[in-house]
């Protein structure tokens, strides 16, 4: 099972139907990847994601989505080992996904599809990053994007 929390930071909350769409996207992706755990999705404005992108990635501009995985140790962090017998007592916190709502609107218009489809795409994209997928090489990109499309097709978010 996947537990999802949706937060709004420095923006008006999106409506309940869109929030349910994000949950459906994440549940479909989790099912495809056979993973359980907890995910927090925070919806922000361009100024906030710009700040996070600059502070955490060293890129001084807004972006569409950022992912902060909890299951991969960062540089200089100590790895935590949990006894298998005790593992069920701890939730599998997969991480945080930060999405710029204004950027999603812009990109939906640029790509000629719905805002819902763009928001779903960014949600699944961020989720796959939490699981370690990347698109730094053509092979990685092909694998990641095919998984994204499979999830989006499954829930009816086609182009």
From Swiss-Prot:
This is Endoribonuclease YbeY. GO terms for molecular function: metalloendopeptidase activity; RNA endonuclease activity; zinc ion binding. Single strand-specific metallo-endoribonuclease involved in late-stage 70S ribosome quality control and in maturation of the 3' terminus of the 16S rRNA. Pfam families: YbeY. Signal peptide: none annotated. Keywords: Cytoplasm, Endonuclease, Hydrolase, Metal-binding, Nuclease, Ribosome biogenesis, rRNA processing, Zinc. Its cofactor is Zn(2+). GO terms for cellular component: cytoplasm. Binds 1 zinc ion. Its EC number is 3.1.-.-. It is an enzyme of class 3 (hydrolase). Disulfide bonds: none annotated. It is found in: Cytoplasm. The lineage of its organism: Bacteria, Bacillati, Bacillota, Bacilli, Bacillales. The gene is ybeY. GO terms for biological process: rRNA processing. Zn(2+) binds at residues 125, 129, 135. The keyword rRNA processing applies.
């Amino acid at each position: 099972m996947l537990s999802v929390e949706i937060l709004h930071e420095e923006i008006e909350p999106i409506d309940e139907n869109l929030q349910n769409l994000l949950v459906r996207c994440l549940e479909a992706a989790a099912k495809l990847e056979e993973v359980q755990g907890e995910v927090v999705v925070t919806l922000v404005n361009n100024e906030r994601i710009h700040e996070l992108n600059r502070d955490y990635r060293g890129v001084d501009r807004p972006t569409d989505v950022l992912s902060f995985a909890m299951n991969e140790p960062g540089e200089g962090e100590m790895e935590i080992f949990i006894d298998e017998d005790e593992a069920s007592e701890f939730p599998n916190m997969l991480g945080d996904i930060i999405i710029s709502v204004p950027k999603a609107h812009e990109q939906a218009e640029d790509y000629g599809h719905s805002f819902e489809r763009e928001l779903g795409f960014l949600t699944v994209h961020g989720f796959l990053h939490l699981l370690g997928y990347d698109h730094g090489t053509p092979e990685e990109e092909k694998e990641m994007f095919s998984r994204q499309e499979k999830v989006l097709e499954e829930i009816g978010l086609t182009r």
